[in-house]
Amino acid sequence: MMQKSDQPALKQIAMVLLFDRRNRLLIYLRDDKPDIPFPNHWDFFGGHVEEGETPEGALIREVKEELGVELVDWRFFRTYVCTEGDAYPNVKYIYWAKVEKAPQELVLYEGQTLRSLTLDERANIRFANVLGAILEDFIAVGLWPRPVDNLPS
């Protein structure tokens, strides 16, 4: 028999490791405002799953709101239950996807700036919350796509 818990349900967050047409990871610099968690840190695209919404629905909505891109193809990576190391306890649904665009073809609607990141550049990045560890997990299982260097920037 299931017992009712006095604990509030964990907030749900859907995020995507989004790669550009050269297979570089697209990340954005969070605003530098003292009233937001992890100001001036680099972040993945995505956000909160709203009531009645699936994680996939939230992912599509958030990427459209933040980057103006309609995600049509994505893959699930992992679920993380984050009880520490973040602004509040949450469940993160992590996906990965690719957009066939160069960074300069994209418009960032939230945050300070957009960046495309190579595998080797990640060590110098200050990621928000537990995202650095999530990225390392993604790399460890061999999912970072091979670079495509024969395309114009």
Protein language model annotation of sequence segments:
Residues 24-61, 65:
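Conserved Nudix-box catalytic region and its N-terminal flanking loop in Nudix hydrolases
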Residues 70-78:
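A short coil-to-beta-strand element that immediately follows conserved catalytic motifs
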Residues 11, 39-44, 88-92:
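Short connector loops at helix/strand junctions that flank enzyme active sites
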Residues 20-22, 80-104, 137:
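Active-site-adjacent beta-strand/loop module that shapes the phosphate/pyrophosphate-binding cleft
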Residues 132-153:
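Charged phosphate-binding loop/patch that engages nucleotide di/tri-phosphates or the phosphate backbone
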Residues 2-26:
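Conserved N-terminal beta-strand and adjoining loop/helix that marks the start
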Residues 96, 105-138:
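NUDIX/MutT-family hydrolases
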